[in-house]
Amino acid sequence: MNNISRYLIILFLTVVAPFGLAAQNNALLERLYDTFANNCIALDCTYSIVSDAVPVKGQCEIEFQGTSYKMKGGGLEIFCDGASVWIMDADVMEAVIEPVSDESQTYMSNPALLFRDMDQMFSVSGSSAAGAAMRYRLSAQKPCGVRTAVLDIDKNAVLQKAEFMMDNDCVIRIDVKSVTVLPKKENSAFAPGKISSAWVVTDLR
């Protein structure tokens, strides 16, 4: 999976994870998590990635439910049904299939593990008003690839924007154009289906 796509998947799974909230002023974040945790969610976003290299900007669509997701952006389509991950490049008709496994995996290479363990990984370090929104600052408690995060959530508990500082000092900013709540789906909806024999497939499972 290329780094841009990997970052984006990790960041969205960070947003929907439980943070062990306690204080009353975290109510909007609790509502956001409750909505995301109990539904299938579709997001349409723009992003920018700032690092020592040339800044990267783009648009992506992501749909997720629990530890299953599918994403389109950065020239790739990525599917995960909770057991396997498919990274597909239609331009060159190539696909790589990877397992979702606890063994020899890091949080950066397996976003599903990051989602599963997020209640242990992050805590809310502060919150404040940001215009009409509430801004939440999150800090990592254990190494997971993301050092800190800032989320802006409006009065209706809808995510507006997010900024993430990665362990490698890369900064990723995301503006959410739309959030759609969908009915829950079977895990098979997050797999690509039969891949044409014209594709070059590398199966690492």
PLM regions: where:
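N-terminal leader/targeting segments and the immediate start of mature chains
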Residues: 19-55, 67, 193-205
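Non-transmembrane domains of secretory- and envelope-associated proteins
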Residues: 130, 141-148, 155-205
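Flexible, surface-exposed loop/linker segments and immediately adjacent secondary-structure boundaries
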Residues: 100-131
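Short beta-strand segments that buttress and anchor functional surface loops
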Residues: 45-49, 70-74, 135-142, 161-165
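One face of beta-strands
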Residues: 41-47, 58-62, 67-71, 147, ...
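Bacterial N-terminal signal peptides that target proteins for export
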Residues: 1-9
